[in-house]
Amino acid sequence: MQYKKTLVASALAATTLAAYAPSEPWSTLTPTATYSGGVTDYASTFGIAVQPISTTSSASSAATTASSKAKRAASQIGDGQVQAATTTASVSTKSTAAAVSQIGDGQIQATTKTTAAAVSQIGDGQIQATTKTTSAKTTAAAVSQISDGQIQATTTTLAPKSTAAAVSQIGDGQVQATTTTLAPKSTAAAVSQIGDGQVQATTKTTAAAVSQIGDGQVQATTKTTAAAVSQIGDGQVQATTKTTAAAVSQIGDGQVQATTKTTAAAVSQITDGQVQATTKTTQAASQVSDGQVQATTATSASAAATSTDPVDAVSCKTSGTLEMNLKGGILTDGKGRIGSIVANRQFQFDGPPPQAGAIYAAGWSITPDGNLAIGDNDVFYQCLSGTFYNLYDEHIGSQCTPVHLEAIDLIDC
């Protein structure tokens, strides 16, 4: 009889083991729905900036109210958590926001200011931002001054990309952003990243130094390049509260001039002081003896070539900047950690593999409006945690407000 009981127990154990299956691969942890028109593969490295959404707007209508949104950069600290700043301000569409940073733990955090200050990342991957918000400046075509003192601008009105501050990452993977937000084309301060991956940003906004040439003219570039963000050990992303503006230069006669964006056609000046721009963005205009500036007749196809790029903001990249890549719907940071929505609905970077109990680790995309999305959702929530906001994909409490995570290209400055 005892022998029969042993056989039965063995049979039951075998059946139980046969029914057990290991957890599914993390790359399959993806939402069932996808964002219409979303890009799941992006060719270049990019960062993110936190753009608050009006609390009276629904998630479905949020994309149509971009012009009334205040933008702040998110930061990431080392543990991979993503956090945002605590104050918001209305800015124009595509206004420049501070880039977010990441610390070591991968957490993403944003500061309480919505200035365009760059964000940093600490070791845990958390992303954090500063607490202040400021209005951003819109970037217009650079103007030049001729010998008679007249100030003229080019004839082409190209739509340059707005410059946002780069974000940084700390060791834990948390992402944090600065507390101030700038309008389009404003330059944000660079952010750093610590070991845990958290990203955090500073709280002040500062303009880049200007230069002066012999005649006293002051010149500045037309692109407001934002400082890149840094990352600390835990992966958290944090951003500084300062925003750095593009430096301007001054020439000998005291006139102040700004450089043109690389996407805009170069303009030339002729003897009579008139300034003319070429119709082809890749061709420079010529100058004749009477001072008139003339442009080439070829039409530019550059706008059409870049029209499919959903990202229209740029930021300077520095050491520790929160650098993200999107391939096949999988989001990774500069340390190769996986961007995921963890069990408490927080957005952070971990692994690989992602944190145990992660809900989503794939299914990321960039929407046609240039916002980061998970599945068919591009609305995230910044929830106050001390002096920073953590970022979540769902509303989890009264201290949470909806935001968009705007993608920003990172460039070497």
Curated annotation (Swiss-Prot):
- The segments carrying the PIR1/2/3 repeats are 73-89, 97-115, 116-134, 140-158, 164-182, 188-206, 207-225, 226-244, 245-263, 264-282, 283-300
Q: So which domain of life are we looking at? A: Eukaryota
Q: Which PROSITE patterns match?
A: PIR_REPEAT_1 (PS00929), PIR_REPEAT_2 (PS50256)
- Annotated signal peptide: 1-18
Summarize induction of expression.
Positively regulated by signaling through MPK1 in response to cell wall perturbation. Induced by heat shock and nitrogen starvation. Expression is also regulated by the ACE2 and SWI5 transcription factors.
Q: Where is this site: Cleavage?
A: 72-73
As recorded, the propeptide runs across 19-72
Does the record carry NADP as a key word? no
InterPro entries xref list: PIR1-like_C, Yeast_CWMannoprotein_PIR, Yeast_PIR_rpt
What are this entry's molecular-function GO terms? ATP hydrolysis activity; structural constituent of cell wall
- An example Gene Ontology cellular component term from the record? cytosol
In the record, the effect of residue 175 to I is given as: In strain: TD04/1a and TD04/1b
Query: Mind listing the UniProt keywords for this protein, alphabetically?
Result: Cell wall, Cell wall biogenesis/degradation, Cleavage on pair of basic residues, Glycoprotein, Repeat, Secreted, Signal, Stress response
Q: Name one Pfam family in it.
A: PIR
Q: Which GO terms describe its biological process?
A: fungal-type cell wall organization
Instruction: Kindly provide the PTM information from the record.
Output: Covalently linked to beta-1,3-glucan of the inner cell wall layer via an alkali-sensitive ester linkage between the gamma-carboxyl group of glutamic acids, arising from specific glutamines within the PIR1/2/3 repeats, and hydroxyl groups of glucoses of beta-1,3-glucan chains. The propeptide is cleaved off in the late Golgi. While both peptides are secreted, only a fraction of the mature glycoprotein is incorporated into the cell wall.
Question: Per UniProt, what does mutating residue 96 to S do?
Answer: In strain: B1, TD04/1a and TD04/1b
Q: Where is this site: Covalent attachment to cell wall glycan?
A: 81, 107, 126, 150, 174, 198, 217, 236, 255, 274, 292
Q: Where in the cell is it found?
A: Secreted, Cell wall
Q: What else is known?
A: Present with 14600 molecules/cell in log phase SD medium.
Query: What does the entry's free-text domain comment contain?
Result: The PIR1/2/3 repeats are required for the covalent linkage to the cell wall. Their number varies among different strains of S.cerevisiae.
Return the similarity comment.
Answer: Belongs to the PIR protein family.
What is known about what this protein does? Component of the outer cell wall layer. Required for stability of the cell wall and for optimal growth. Required for resistance against several antifungal and cell wall-perturbing agents and for tolerance to heat shock.
Q: What is this protein's name?
A: Cell wall mannoprotein HSP150
Q: Which gene encodes it?
A: HSP150
